[in-house]
């Protein structure tokens, strides 16, 4: 049976890759699972406001029945009234507890006052939900950055391979021209050898570019959490020329960065921890009740049901409450200091990434102008060589110079794309990436 060749994976656009990464990345899925966990914990915390009702069946076996024996009193009564026949006076005894007892009690307990601890627990649960939500946003930003690096890294590797292939094809044609001119006696043997050496080096670089493509493809598959081969990226590299000033990105970072949102949630969480520890100094007041469902084994002195109000006051705990309160206040101080540092770090990070994007954009613009000169130089050197007035080395140098400009131009575009993704992550605006990529002020970069 002949094996059919494996089907080529379909081309992959960046929006498709982003949807796949957000749907399959384990770190992001774990962050979303934590949000669901915190949501359920928030619902569970609301149950603290309600009474708890429990059912605890008990079977007890005693060594004997427990009796209430009042016969000594009966004897005294008979002595005081000798005219009464003893047979007419029943025994003064009763069974309080049988040897075998089955109890089916329903018990209830309802907190009435806890010093604010239940409210603090609910507000803390809400803060944990917000913390998990901000963490998920942070994970989404990280997935976008990783995908940009991997997706456009593969695109860059494919473009570089295409450039290397064109250079190799051009040098192979140059070798053929050199051999023909050598046979015609128009150039020396050394000129043909120079062309063949350059062709061999171009072939080596082309093979190396092929390996780089496979490495980049494996990296993209890892980001997409895909065990299958991934298709070639069809979204080209780009450079956006309509970025707003750096101050706008800095303001956005300080207003809505998910790391700051996490610290805000943790600040609230620390505040609720302080409130809960203060509440521990107050008495706990609760209502309680009991109802016995099996009444046959009840003793004459036991009620079928009871209800009441109780209180619990912690008189001494070895200073534990004071230390826990101090720890909660220290946590508040810690979060406040972390917030100050993060705001300063975000401002610096935004400024650095903005400058990186500007540098890459300027490099691209300069190389775009240089590319036309390199193309014209190669045409002139090739024409001069074919006419016998130029050397093979000049043609090779011109072609390699053209290749260098083309590759550096692609690398500058890739550097811009990466810097843009990191700038948007630093400012908490990862969701703007697609909008900037397709904006009117953006140009697509091809070899």
Language-model segments: residues:
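Periplasmic alpha-helical coiled-coil/stalk elements that build and connect Gram-negative outer-membrane
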Residues: 12, 40, 138-254, 353-356, ...
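A short glycine-centered flexible hinge/capping loop motif at secondary-structure junctions
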Residues: 182-186, 385-389, 426
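Regulatory alphaC helix of protein kinase catalytic domains
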Residues: 8-18
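Alpha-helical heptad-repeat coiled-coil segments that mediate oligomerization/polymerization in large
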Residues: 188, 346, 353, 388-392
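Acidic, low-complexity, intrinsically disordered peripheral segments
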Residues: 5-7, 61-67, 72, 408-447
């Amino acid at each position: 049976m002949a094996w059919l060749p494996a089907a080529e994976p379909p081309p992959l656009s960046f929006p498709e890759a982003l949807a796949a990464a957000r749907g399959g990345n384990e770190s992001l899925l774990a962050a979303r699972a934590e949000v669901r966990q915190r949501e359920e914990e928030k619902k569970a915390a609301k149950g603290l406001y309600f009474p708890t009702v429990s059912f605890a069946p008990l079977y007890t076996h005693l060594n004997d029945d427990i009796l209430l024996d009042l016969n000594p009193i009966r004897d005294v009564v008979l002595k005081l009234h000798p005219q009464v026949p003893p047979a007419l006076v029943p025994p003064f005894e009763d069974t309080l507890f049988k040897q075998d007892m089955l109890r089916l009690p329903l018990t209830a307990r309802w907190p009435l006052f806890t010093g604010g601890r239940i409210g603090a627990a609910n507000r803390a649960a809400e803060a944990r939900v917000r913390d998990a939500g901000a963490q998920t946003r942070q994970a989404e930003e990280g997935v976008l950055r990783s995908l940009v690096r991997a997706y456009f890294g593969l695109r860059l590797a494919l473009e570089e391979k295409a450039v290397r292939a064109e250079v190799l094809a051009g040098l192979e044609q140059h070798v053929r021209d050199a051999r023909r001119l050598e046979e015609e006696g128009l150039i020396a043997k050394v000129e043909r050898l120079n062309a063949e050496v350059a062709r061999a080096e171009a072939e080596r670089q082309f093979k190396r570019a092929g390996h780089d493509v496979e490495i980049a493809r494996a990296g993209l598959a890892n980001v997409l959490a895909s065990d299958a081969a991934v298709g070639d990226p069809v979204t080209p590299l780009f450079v956006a020329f309509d970025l707003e000033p750096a101050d706008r990105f800095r303001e956005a970072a300080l207003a809505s960065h998910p790391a700051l949102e996490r610290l805000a949630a943790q600040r609230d969480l620390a505040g609720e921890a302080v409130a809960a520890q203060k509440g521990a100094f107050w008495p706990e007041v609760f209502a309680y009740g009991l109802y016995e469902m099996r009444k046959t084994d009840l003793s004459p002195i036991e009620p079928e049901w009871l209800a009441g109000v109780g209180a619990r006051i912690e008189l001494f705990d070895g200073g534990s409450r004071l230390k826990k309160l101090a720890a909660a206040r220290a946590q508040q101080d810690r979060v406040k200091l972390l917030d100050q540092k993060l705001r300063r770090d975000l401002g610096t990070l935004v400024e650095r990434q903005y400058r990186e994007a500007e540098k890459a954009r300027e490099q691209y613009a300069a190389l775009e102008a240089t590319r036309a000169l390199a193309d014209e130089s190669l045409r002139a050197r090739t024409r001069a060589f074919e006419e016998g007035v130029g050397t093979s080395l000049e043609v090779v140098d011109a072609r390699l110079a053209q290749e260098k400009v083309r590759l550096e131009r692609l690398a500058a575009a890739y550097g811009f794309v990466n810097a843009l993704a990191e700038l948007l992550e630093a400012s908490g605006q990862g969701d703007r990436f697609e909008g900037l990529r397709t904006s009117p002020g953006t140009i697509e970069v091809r070899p």
